From Swiss-Prot:
UniProt-recorded name of the protein: Glutamate mutase sigma subunit
Keyword vocabulary terms for this entry: Cobalamin, Cobalt, Isomerase, Metal-binding
Cofactor entry: adenosylcob(III)alamin
The organism's taxonomic lineage, starting at the top: Bacteria, Pseudomonadati, Spirochaetota, Spirochaetia, Spirochaetales
List of residues binding adenosylcob(III)alamin: 14-18, 62-64, 94-98
Metabolic or biological pathway, per its Swiss-Prot or TrEMBL entry: Amino-acid degradation; L-glutamate degradation via mesaconate pathway; acetate and pyruvate from L-glutamate: step 1/4
Length: 139
């Protein structure tokens, strides 16, 4: 039997939106993933430390208060410096201020090193599908 995909999940920065985080935690766990949920109000270092402690395969960052772009800057570089080079980075939610063209938002987050970038309202099934595609040996 294949090892479960290990995920670190949390809400970055000063964002305290907990309901979506709990829904993601439940849905991903039910789908067979091993989820470490660091909760809300989480700085980048908490994601990195949890990923190191759990030997995570991916970090899933959520943000709903619109400041995700600021909060996520430098995360890829910090992951690399901490020994997590190549860890998959996912981000989703209301990750920028105001209504912006999502193609442009996607480009900016991809340039920051994120592997998957999701707009508000993305079904969790999309993330699950992407996780299985990224880790076919664990599906």
């Amino acid at each position: 039997m294949a090892r479960k995909i290990k995920l670190v999940l949390g809400v970055i920065g000063s964002d305290c939106h907990a309901v979506g985080n709990k829904i993601l935690d439940y849905s991903l766990t039910e789908a067979g993933f091993e989820v470490t949920n660091i909760g809300v109000l989480s700085p980048q270092e908490d994601f990195i430390n949890a990923a190191l402690e759990t030997n995570a395969d991916a970090i899933l960052v959520s943000s709903l208060y619109g400041q995700g772009e600021l909060d996520c800057k430098g995360l890829r570089e910090k992951c690399d410096e901490a020994g997590l080079k190549g860890i998959k980075l996912f981000v989703g939610g209301n990750i920028v201020v105001g209504k912006q063209n999502f193609d442009e938002v996607h480009k900016r987050f991809t340039a920051m090193g994120f592997d998957h970038v999701y707009p508000p309202g993305t079904p969790v099934e999309t993330t699950i599908k992407d996780l299985h595609a990224d880790f076919p040996d664990h599906a």
